[in-house]
UniProtKB/Swiss-Prot annotation:
<feature type="active site" description="Proton acceptor">
    <location>
        <position position="144"/>
    </location>
</feature>
<feature type="domain" description="Protein kinase">
    <location>
        <begin position="15"/>
        <end position="300"/>
    </location>
</feature>
<keyword id="KW-0418">Kinase</keyword>
<feature type="region of interest" description="Leucine-zipper">
    <location>
        <begin position="453"/>
        <end position="474"/>
    </location>
</feature>
<dbReference type="GO" id="GO:0005524">
    <property type="term" value="F:ATP binding"/>
</dbReference>
<keyword id="KW-0597">Phosphoprotein</keyword>
<keyword id="KW-0067">ATP-binding</keyword>
<dbReference type="GO" id="GO:0005737">
    <property type="term" value="C:cytoplasm"/>
</dbReference>
<dbReference type="InterPro" id="IPR011009">
    <property type="entry name" value="Kinase-like_dom_sf"/>
</dbReference>
<dbReference type="InterPro" id="IPR041185">
    <property type="entry name" value="IKBKB_SDD"/>
</dbReference>
<dbReference type="GO" id="GO:0008384">
    <property type="term" value="F:IkappaB kinase activity"/>
</dbReference>
<keyword id="KW-0547">Nucleotide-binding</keyword>
<comment type="similarity">
    <text>Belongs to the protein kinase superfamily. Ser/Thr protein kinase family. I-kappa-B kinase subfamily.</text>
</comment>
<dbReference type="Pfam" id="PF00069">
    <property type="entry name" value="Pkinase"/>
</dbReference>
<keyword id="KW-0539">Nucleus</keyword>
<keyword id="KW-0808">Transferase</keyword>
<comment type="function">
    <text>Phosphorylates inhibitors of NF-kappa-B thus leading to the dissociation of the inhibitor/NF-kappa-B complex and ultimately the degradation of the inhibitor. Phosphorylates 'Ser-10' of histone H3 at NF-kappa-B-regulated promoters during inflammatory responses triggered by cytokines.</text>
</comment>
Amino acid sequence: MEKPPVQHGAVCGPWDMKDRLGTGGFGNVCLYQNRETGELKAIKSCRLELSMKNKERWCQEIQIMKRLNHPNVVKACEVPPEMDFLVNDVPHLAMEYCAGGDLRKLLNKPENCCGLKESQVLNLMSDIGSGIQYLHEKRIIHRDLKPENIVLQECNGKTVHKIIDLGYAKDLDQGSLCTSFVGTLQYLAPELFENKPYSVTVDYWSFGTMVFECIAGFRPFLHNMQPFTWHEKIKKKDHKHIYAYEEMSGEIRFSSYLPQPNNLCSIIVDKIETWLQLLLNWDPIQRGGGMDCGRPQCFVLMDQILNLKIVHILNMTSAKIHSFHLQPEESLHTLQSRIETETGISTCNQELLLEMGVSLDPRKPASQCVIDGVKGWDSYMVYLFDKSKTVYEGPFQSRSLSECLNYIVQDSKVQLPIPQLRKVWAEAVHYVSGLKEDYSRLFQGQRAAMLSLLRFNTNLTKMKNTMVSASQQLGAKLQFFKRSIEIDLERYSDQMAYGISSEKMLRAWKEMEDKAVCFGKAGKIHFLDETIMGLHTEIVELQKSPCARRQGDVMEHLEQRAMELYKQLKPRSPDKAYSDSTEMVKILVQTVQGQDRVLKELFGHLSKLLGCKQKIIDLLPQIEMTVNNIKEADSSLMQMQAKRQREIWHLLKIACTQSSARSLGPASVETPITPRTSAWPDQSSSQALFSMLTTKDKSREILRHTIDKNSDYQKLLSSLILQTQTTMEQNSLMSLDFSWLNK
């Protein structure tokens, strides 16, 4: 059953049309949403009456789409029953919806006028290269690869590129090709222009053209000319030429190198230039480089590029970025030696920080600098600091102006034709954006330094707490030791007249008292504590400082103004207008001045951070030494306490043995003293106890048990005293061993 094309805002059962996503040669692609489930689908419907050939082409696309399943080729899905009808004698095609729009939309953004970022280029190469290989394995040649036929979808935080529009796949009529491809000829391989036999290498040409445009912001070969015009001029190029441009004189120039400016690091530039030479070879047989291990050489080289491990290091002392291709299992020390060669910073003075302020681990390989699955120097950076410096003198010299930018800065009122002005202003936008990004990277480096400082501060706080705790414990033990030795000395003096005396022991105890005073000095941490508290306050102030937050608002505003100027220029007719660059030059000058101001503040703040960190580094060994001294004092104090306690117990033993000698006379320490044998209550005491317990209504059994137990203890004590008396008869005080005083 056939129905008219669906109009905007139309309803098909539970499906509402939400948006028109695109219009092709014969069809419209519209977005539909299911009101009940929220499901989204892209529905392609025919908008014109088609010839029999084109009807076959339409149906063939549907059949091809239904048998493909690859993450980088858009998937076909079931047409909702409510839309399962014919429009202009052909069915609808339902596809997954990709919310990121197409690649053309991304390239048209002013910020991408000089190409995409490195991470975006590498991601695109990986996705589209994988999709093309899959199609070729399925014996499908796309033949119409272009930015409009690449859509973007966010998946788990990553942008995924998908190939769409297989309406001109391999089996399409070759004779009608030129008329069918009106408007997209800029990406077609030369043999398709010439109506010659072709192979999968036509997709290589389109792929290379598209990647070049993503890198430079424009197509590689005379992009301002019509396809049929540049075709005749470019066919003379050498197989290594990947770029052609027209001089002011009208002369055509060829180059084997990517144009500047672009956003690729030098290591990637060299590799991609070689890769593009394979893809943009005019000869379809040589294009792609032949087979290598069963695969086209261009895809082998592409994989090598994508698998490169490159570490990007921002030297915070010079604001320059250094990129290093890491070798397998390269050690961090080897990388640091290479860094020393390029920067002049010795390996012992290098501090390499990740974005979160974590220092690189010297025990791990250099690959710890690279994040798995993350490509491009715009995505991650390692920050290099010189530990021998605490004052960074920035700002540094701004980016150098290109020849054409320098031309308009020298004379901002010079009139230029619109096509030339577009190129110059595109470079101006790129320059302004570059200055802003330079600041952003340096700010991120400052932030890494702040996070590193906070890590050091956390370590400082832990060590301080350990020191304070150890000091407090030592103080408490000293207080106990001093008080106990004072009491011991007092009691010793009290009993000297009738008890035991030893000058050697007394001298040893007084020496202990003096040593305890010295040990107390080890626990004096007041100065260190105050210094640490001052550092904590300084760090809090640095965190509160406006310089700790981004100061690039003015530069971002100037970047937006530059983009607006470029957007206003773009739609103007190139044939009728000339214009000067007064406004754009003003923005350039203001951006340079703005960067100079914010970088002065940034490096002033950074110097304070690094100075504060150096103070912590200098303090840590002092704290460690203080803690060790406290521990040593604590240990020595405990040893003295233990020694004195052993002496006291020895004295107690002597006192016990001497007690029996006192019966011979109070003045003689050698005469045994006969103690009272009855050290426990006598009979009258027992009666008093019995009376007291009876008064309290205690049972007779408990009373009898208590009295019996008392008698047992009395007999035991009497036995011990008799034993002591016997021992004293065999020993005198003068024969006792006092060698323990020397221990």
